[in-house]
Design a protein with these regions (language model features):
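Serine-esterase "nucleophile elbow" of acetyl-processing enzymes
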Residues: 18-65, 76-85, 90, 221-222
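Hydrophobic h-region of N-terminal signal peptides that target proteins for export
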Residues: 9-18
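Alpha-helical cap/lid subdomain in secreted, periplasmic
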Residues: 54, 76-258
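Alpha-helical transmembrane segments and their juxtamembrane interfaces
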Residues: 12-13, 43, 166
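Acidic/histidine-rich helix-loop elements
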Residues: 38-42, 61-70, 108-116, 234
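Short gly/ser/thr-rich secondary-structure transition/capping motifs
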Residues: 72-74
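Active-site neighborhood of divalent metal-dependent phosphoester/pyrophosphate hydrolases
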Residues: 30-33, 68, 97-102
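Positively charged n-region of N-terminal signal peptides that target proteins for export
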Residues: 1-4
Length: 259
């Protein structure tokens, strides 16, 4: 019996075509924390340096050491002031400091009942509205995404999940256990990773799951080769760790829709 196989190919403006890299020369803004900071915390080259080398991306770096998601609103506003019309894509790479700061997860929406015209008749329907604010992690993401969506309606936004957390000590009053431990409100880092994944659907943004796809796992000593210091800092990737992050991103960008 002869079998017929139907192949359906979706043709779009993918970012690698004809052997040419369509990301070359594109300006990409990077919002985030120490892993994005241009001062190179724990490394001499960040993931965005490697993306520049691999794909020819022009980096616009706004990440600041220690910043939580609530601080990225200020980074986004600075981006808007400095590059109102010439940024091609935006990366958001944060959340690990929100976990460390014991930030409650919160809710995306608050729900009410409102009367509205439906098919010519006034009916009472449930209605949801975004919860904004700095008190919760979801509220902080809503704050940030509102600014980004209103300021950059045409630019793709990429949400990166935090990498796994290893042990780190930066002094007697700044000792951070590894991710085997919940924070002081009982939440593991996984919960913050999951919220960022949810945000992709809530805000129509592309999620790149660096937590999974980078392969970085600082809970094991064998992964010390990818981190700043085996004894004192298994939190910040070194150059080798950043290159793995960059490659995980590059794999996704090579097959994504062009900015």
């Amino acid at each position: 019996m002869r079998k017929t196989i139907l192949c359906i190919i979706a043709v779009g403006a993918l970012c690698v075509y004809g052997g040419e890299n369509a990301w070359s020369g594109k300006k990409v803004a990077y919002l985030g924390d120490s892993i994005t900071d241009a001062r190179h915390i724990g490394c001499t080259s960040n993931y965005w340096n490697f993306l520049e080398a691999k794909l020819g991306i022009v980096p616009l770096v706004y990440g600041i050491n220690g910043h939580q998601m609530k601080h990225l609103v200020g980074q986004a506003e600075k981006l808007k002031a400095e590059h109102p019309d010439d940024v091609d894509a935006i990366f958001v790479f944060a959340g690990t400091n929100d976990y460390n700061a014991n930030t409650p997860l919160g809710s995306w929406y608050e729900e009410t009942t409102e009367t509205v015209n439906r098919n010519g008749t006034q009916v009472a329907l449930k209605c949801r509205n975004f919860v904004y604010g700095e008190a919760t992690f979801r509220g902080r993401i809503n704050n940030l995404m509102k600014v980004l969506r209103e300021s950059f309606p045409a630019q793709p936004i990429y949400l990166l999940t935090p990498i796994h957390r290893g042990y780190a000590t930066f002094g007697a009053s700044n000792v951070q256990p590894d991710e085997s431990y919940a924070n002081e409100i009982g939440e593991y880092i996984d919960a913050y990773v999951d919220v960022i994944k949810e945000a992709g659907n809530v805000w129509a943004a592309t999620v790149i799951d660096i937590n999974a796809e980078s392969g970085l796992f600082p809970l094991f000593a064998s992964h010390a080769r990818f981190f700043n210091n085996a004894q004192t800092d298994m939190l910040h990737p070194n150059n080798a760790g950043h290159e793995r992050i960059a490659e995980a991103i590059a794999v996704r960008l090579r097959s994504s829709v062009c900015p």
